[in-house]
């Protein structure tokens, strides 16, 4: 199995800096595991590694999509797997850094497209509305057209299962009937970064203020001119809150506060997910920056272990 390091944790805890340090120490290359950093031109709101940071180590899966393009978990896995193989064949260490938990789970554990698949409340509600307004048969016929195998196993009257199957197809870009969990082809080592919650929230609030000062509003205006809220990239935190109030300066302060709140909530969800779904080794580099030496020792020990 190929050894892969994964640097995970909530926003604003130092994942980018640690990934670069690991890449420099172990001849590594960094693969972004973030669903928003794939978008070109959206640098500030996605907390993308700066040009100076990217120059310190090879980076992959950053700036590969236009803002009007979807980027599904299936696309991520399809892009990341050959990258990991190529990095390994170069004799380098693949390092996946990012906060989109389901992407990493799909990569390391195999794509699960059933109950464990991600959901989208807006898509779900839209599909339910179709069932109410046009009848369950119309919804089931949509599924039959897109995934006949799944439709053959779901009665046309079962609205809940029909909605779930269509939701998974739209969110993941994969057929619902292609449920799989082939098991990992990788030996992954999860490094989890976190810090005390009050300090984490303080850092998140400061990061949002820094983003605004760095030109986040200009980035959102650029996005608005290209389709705004209709674009797949517009769903990200920082963009979705500001797009509706660009022409309402009196509401900007409240929107920025909302970004902070949404970011804090997202960080909490990230932590919950990684604690329950991974066997991460947790460290606090915010309060104890000297721990980076221990991380390097731990990775060294893991690298010397046989698969």
UniProtKB/Swiss-Prot annotation:
<dbReference type="InterPro" id="IPR027417">
    <property type="entry name" value="P-loop_NTPase"/>
</dbReference>
<dbReference type="Pfam" id="PF01715">
    <property type="entry name" value="IPPT"/>
</dbReference>
<keyword id="KW-0460">Magnesium</keyword>
<comment type="similarity">
    <text>Belongs to the IPP transferase family.</text>
</comment>
<keyword id="KW-0808">Transferase</keyword>
<dbReference type="GO" id="GO:0006400">
    <property type="term" value="P:tRNA modification"/>
</dbReference>
<dbReference type="GO" id="GO:0005524">
    <property type="term" value="F:ATP binding"/>
</dbReference>
<dbReference type="InterPro" id="IPR039657">
    <property type="entry name" value="Dimethylallyltransferase"/>
</dbReference>
<comment type="subunit">
    <text>Monomer.</text>
</comment>
<protein>
    <recommendedName>
        <fullName>tRNA dimethylallyltransferase</fullName>
        <ecNumber>2.5.1.75</ecNumber>
    </recommendedName>
</protein>
<feature type="binding site">
    <location>
        <begin position="11"/>
        <end position="16"/>
    </location>
    <ligand>
        <name>substrate</name>
    </ligand>
</feature>
<keyword id="KW-0819">tRNA processing</keyword>
<keyword id="KW-0067">ATP-binding</keyword>
<feature type="binding site">
    <location>
        <begin position="9"/>
        <end position="16"/>
    </location>
    <ligand>
        <name>ATP</name>
    </ligand>
</feature>
<keyword id="KW-0547">Nucleotide-binding</keyword>
<feature type="site" description="Interaction with substrate tRNA">
    <location>
        <position position="100"/>
    </location>
</feature>
<comment type="function">
    <text>Catalyzes the transfer of a dimethylallyl group onto the adenine at position 37 in tRNAs that read codons beginning with uridine, leading to the formation of N6-(dimethylallyl)adenosine (i(6)A).</text>
</comment>
<dbReference type="GO" id="GO:0052381">
    <property type="term" value="F:tRNA dimethylallyltransferase activity"/>
</dbReference>
<dbReference type="InterPro" id="IPR018022">
    <property type="entry name" value="IPT"/>
</dbReference>
<feature type="site" description="Interaction with substrate tRNA">
    <location>
        <position position="124"/>
    </location>
</feature>
<feature type="region of interest" description="Interaction with substrate tRNA">
    <location>
        <begin position="34"/>
        <end position="37"/>
    </location>
</feature>
